[in-house]
C-alpha cells in the first residue's frame, strides 16, 4: 500500500472504505505491506512525498516555451491558470529543472527496489468524492483544482509506472477509484493484477 502525498488529505469516510477494501485483499491471501512494515516502502514513500512539485516543475519547464508563444499570440484566449503556471515555470533555472529530473530518478530507483518485496502496489486514485465547483464565480480567487485533486496521480507520473484505475469504492453515493500500480514496462502484469482485483474483490460503499 502506497500512501503517497495524498493520504493526509483523504477524508475519513474514504479512508474507512479503502481500509475495508484492503481487508478483503488480506482475506483473499494477499499480504498488504505498509511503510511501517518495510524500509523499502518507507524509502519509496519519502521519494514520492513531493511528487506533485517534481512533476509540475518538470512539465512546466518543458512546456513553457509553447505556453509563452500562446500567451504572446493570443493573451485573451489563454486562461489565468495557465498564465499563473507559466509565470512559475519561467522563474525556474536550468539547474532547477535538472534537480527535479534527478529527484524523479531517485524515486524510480526506490520503486524498482520495492519489486523485490511486492508484486504491485495499491493506492487511491483521488482523496475522495468529486468536489463541488462554483465555476470560478470569483475571478480574483480561482479554485485551485476545479476538476479534483491529483495528489494520488503524481507519484505514478514521476515513476513512469503503469497503473489501472478501478471504481471499487462508493463514498456518499459518489464513485471513488483505486489504482493498481506495476513496475515500469510491466503494463501487462499490472493489468492482470487489476483484472484479478475486479473479479475477486467486492466494491465497498460508505454513505
Regions found by a protein language model. Name each.
Residues 1-8, 15, 19-28, 92, ...:
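Structural helix-boundary/capping segments
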Residues 1-2, 54-108, 162-175:
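Short helix-loop capping/hinge segments that flank enzyme active sites or metal/cofactor-binding pockets
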Residues 12-36, 68-73, 97-118, 146:
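Acyltransferase
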Residues 30-52, 86-87:
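Short connector loops at secondary-structure junctions
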Residues 53, 130-150:
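Short, surface-exposed loop/helix-turn segments at secondary-structure junctions
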Residues 113, 143-166:
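Small-aliphatic-rich amphipathic alpha-helix that forms the alpha element of a beta-alpha
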Residues 126:
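Short glycine-/small-residue-rich Rossmann-like dinucleotide-binding loops
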Amino acid at each position: 500500500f502506497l500512501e503517497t502525498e495524498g493520504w493526509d488529505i483523504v477524508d475519513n469516510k474514504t479512508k474507512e472504505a479503502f481500509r475495508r477494501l484492503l481487508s478483503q485483499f488480506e482475506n483473499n491471501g494477499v499480504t498488504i505491506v505498509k511503510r511501517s512494515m518495510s524500509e523499502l516502502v518507507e524509502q519509496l514513500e519519502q521519494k514520492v512525498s513531493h511528487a506533485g512539485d517534481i512533476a509540475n516543475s518538470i512539465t512546466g519547464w518543458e512546456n513553457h516555451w509553447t505556453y509563452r508563444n500562446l500567451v504572446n499570440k493570443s493573451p485573451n484566449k489563454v486562461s489565468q491558470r495557465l498564465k499563473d503556471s507559466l509565470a512559475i515555470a519561467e522563474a525556474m533555472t536550468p539547474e532547477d529543472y535538472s534537480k527535479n529530473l534527478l529527484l524523479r530518478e531517485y524515486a524510480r530507483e526506490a520503486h524498482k527496489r520495492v519489486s523485490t518485496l511486492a508484486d504491485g502496489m495499491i493506492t487511491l486514485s483521488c482523496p475522495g468524492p468529486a468536489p463541488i465547483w462554483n465555476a470560478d464565480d470569483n475571478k480574483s480567487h480561482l479554485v485551485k483544482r476545479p476538476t479534483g485533486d491529483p495528489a494520488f496521480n503524481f507519484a505514478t507520473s514521476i515513476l513512469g509506472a503503469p497503473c489501472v484505475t478501478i471504481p471499487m469504492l462508493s463514498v456518499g453515493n459518489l464513485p471513488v477509484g483505486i489504482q493498481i500500480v506495476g513496475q515500469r514496462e510491466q503494463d501487462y502484469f499490472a493489468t492482470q493484477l487489476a483484472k484479478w482485483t475486479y473479479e475477486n474483490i467486492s466494491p465497498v460503499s460508505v454513505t
